[in-house]
Design a protein with these regions (language model features):
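Short internal beta-strands
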Residues: 16, 87-92, 152-155, 313-315
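Glycine-rich, acidic loop regions that bind phosphate or pyrophosphate groups
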Residues: 19, 94-197
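Thiamine diphosphate
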Residues: 118, 162-164, 170-172, 176-182, ...
Length: 350
């Protein structure tokens, strides 16, 4: 199961053990773990075509996702951005691949992303998508997503290529190997006009303002990061607090921001935080949760206590299922149902 989980497109594996097997008495002979097999083959001609397209671009943009979080993929991606001066935007699952403060990092894209990234997607002429699946949180309208761009998609899973958004060139392969093969073929160049546009948009990005009368989300996230430092591991549950953490956490490296994408499973954070702490016992591990998520799985505190696993739990308590309530406000005429967690009052506190 672990070998399968770490092979090809990495992901969870269900181990389903029937009850009769759990009750049986049998001999156990340990097997030597099989080597992890990763798909590394790719079409070299397609890589050359991709490099030619990138070399001819005036407004190139890299859009990357969780598929490039492995250490082997991060460096060639950063090298590509630097060599060809290509700005990059990313999904929730890829936070930290390109460090905060890197001039080529223009922020998270999509529904919960920043103005600059979404504007860059709309205006780029070449989009290089690496290890990402064009989810509905990014490509809200697949027919108009990056409609002015030639789209190149690189993914280890062939079934993801062109699945949600039509692409012009698709490359099946491990991102690390494909990017390393592409690097010598991509020309070193500058895009002054394109970067000028990027900087103008960045001036219009939303920047939260502190309010002396109440504690604001960015202040909480900022102080947690200041106290725990960039080497800590930050885990989040699912909801508004998750997006605040993604937006305001000043990440420096991959795998220091752990969250649940895709299914968005509430209650994920506490168990993941315990697991992360077991993996890096000498590193501070913090779980950022909402009061709704905390209620989903707070029994795991007993696990942490029983095994003496020291974790830090930060709970945003607004007495509501905040993200669901936000959608009820925006799309359902403020018809609130089952989202208030403060039962003595009809509405949550701010």
């Amino acid at each position: 199961a672990f070998r399968i989980a770490q092979s090809g497109r990495k992901g969870p594996v269900l181990v389903d053990i029937p009850k009769d097997i759990t009750a049986a008495v049998c001999e156990f002979t340990p097997k030597k773990p099989e080597p992890i097999r990763t798909v590394v083959t790719f079409d070299e001609q397609q890589v050359k075509w991709a490099a030619d397209i990138i070399n001819g671009a005036q407004r190139p943009l890299v859009y990357f996702g969780g598929g490039v979080r492995s250490a082997a993929s991060c460096q060639p991606l950063r090298d590509l951005l630097k060599k060809a001066e290509i700005p990059a935007t990313y999904t929730l699952m890829a936070a930290g691949v390109v460090p905060y403060g890197d001039p080529m990092n223009i922020g998270m894209v999509g529904m919960h992303g920043c103005y600059t990234s979404n504007r860059a997607v709309a205006d780029c002429d070449v989009l290089i998508a690496v290890g990402t699946r064009f989810s509905d949180r990014v490509a809200l309208n697949p027919k108009t997503f990056a409609k002015n761009a030639t789209i190149i998609q690189i993914d280890i899973d062939a079934s993801e290529l062109g699945k949600n958004v039509d692409v012009d060139l698709s490359i099946v392969g491990d991102a690390a190997y494909v990017l390393n093969a592409m690097l010598p073929l991509v020309e070193e160049k500058k895009h002054p006009d394109w970067m000028k546009m990027i900087h103008e948009w960045q001036a219009q990005d939303y920047h939260p303002v502190s309010d002396a009368s109440r504690l604001m989300p960015h202040q909480v996230i900022g102080e947690v990061c200041n106290q725990c430092g960039p080497e800590a591991v930050y885990v989040t549950d699912v909801g508004q607090h998750q997006m605040w953490a993604a937006q305001y956490y000043k990440y420096r490296s991959p795998r220091h921001f752990i969250t649940s994408g895709g299914m968005g499973t509430m209650g994920y954070g506490l168990g993941a935080c315990i697991g992360a702490k077991v993996g890096v016992p000498d590193t501070p591990v913090i779980n950022i949760a909402g009061d709704g998520c905390f209620r989903m799985n707070m029994n795991e505190i007993a696990t942490a206590t029983r095994y003496n696993i020291p974790i830090i739990e930060v709970v945003f308590n607004n007495h509501a299922l905040g993200m669901v309530r936000q959608w009820q406000t925006l799309f359902y005429g403020k018809r609130y149902s089952q989202t208030c967690l403060l039962y003595t009052s009809p509405s949550p506190r701010d």
